[in-house]
């Protein structure tokens, strides 16, 4: 489900096939004409749209799309220089924010493990502002095995951790091909992923704060280690 004209527009630009759409009956958005050429479009007032979408303030357009084919890890890694891998990040809003951060800062793709939220879940898609349909993403059943395989393919694997013995992010010279691994808040990355990593890095913190929200930490890491 894509909500809002920006997200619906990005879905269409990404080649996604709409099933149907619901638009504001009083003020149909400009994108309505494009949707009419592709799928049934229904119109409803704010009360109807709120009932259908369960949003207190519904968007002017909501569209259902066929789910696009998900890429494989191998397909994404083949041409990538910068990848984010997340483990056990089960909040769809965090996944959406991570996607938007990675896309906006020039990274090439996202890998999520089996316990992380779906990048195309309704909330992930909304928070990413539709970039979940633009940034390639893949799912892996075994994050540690994937990390080990990517290391064998020439990627430097950087595990972000609050561990005080890790290398400060400021002191890291960005390598040519890099995977940054992010874990769930409080729990962090699993021992297996940490063991498979080639580098452990930390964001220097102050005032007794040990770590940041995973999406905020991803944004900082993606900026500091962006491709040059």
Language model regions located:
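Structured adenosyl-cofactor binding patch, chiefly the S-adenosyl-L-methionine
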Residues: 63-65, 101-105, 119, 123-132, ...
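RNA substrate-binding interface of SAM-dependent RNA methyltransferases
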Residues: 41, 69-70, 75-165
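N-terminal positively charged helical leader segments and presequences
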Residues: 1-56
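Short, structured interface segments
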Residues: 60-70
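Active-site/ligand-binding-proximal alpha/beta "capping" segment
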Residues: 158-209
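Short, acidic/turn-prone active-site loops that include or flank metal/cofactor-
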Residues: 26-27, 46-48, 115-117, 140, ...
């Amino acid at each position: 489900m894509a909500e809002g004209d920006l997200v619906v527009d990005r879905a269409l630009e990404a080649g996604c096939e709409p099933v149907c759409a619901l638009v504001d009956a009083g003020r149909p958005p400009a994108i309505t004409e494009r949707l009419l050429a592709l799928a049934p479009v229904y119109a409803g007032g704010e009360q109807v749209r709120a009932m259908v979408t369960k949003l207190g303030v519904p968007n002017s357009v909501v569209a259902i799309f066929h789910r696009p084919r998900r890429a494989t890890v191998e397909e994404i890694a083949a041409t990538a220089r910068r990848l984010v891998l997340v483990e056990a990040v089960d909040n769809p809003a965090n996944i959406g924010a991570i996607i938007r951060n990675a896309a906006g800062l020039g990274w090439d793709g996202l890998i999520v493990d089996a316990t992380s939220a779906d990048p195309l879940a309704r909330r992930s898609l909304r928070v990413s502002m539709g970039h979940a349909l633009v940034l390639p993403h893949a799912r892996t059943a075994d994050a540690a095995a994937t990390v080990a395989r990517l290391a064998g393919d020439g990627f430097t694997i950087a595990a972000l951790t609050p561990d005080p013995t890790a290398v400060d992010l400021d002191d890291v010279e960005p390598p040519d091909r890099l995977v940054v691994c992010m874990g769930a808040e409080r729990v962090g990355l699993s021992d297996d992923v940490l063991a498979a990593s080639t580098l452990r890095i930390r964001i220097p913190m102050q005032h007794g704060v040990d770590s940041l929200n995973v999406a905020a930490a991803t944004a900082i890491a993606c900026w500091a280690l962006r491709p040059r």
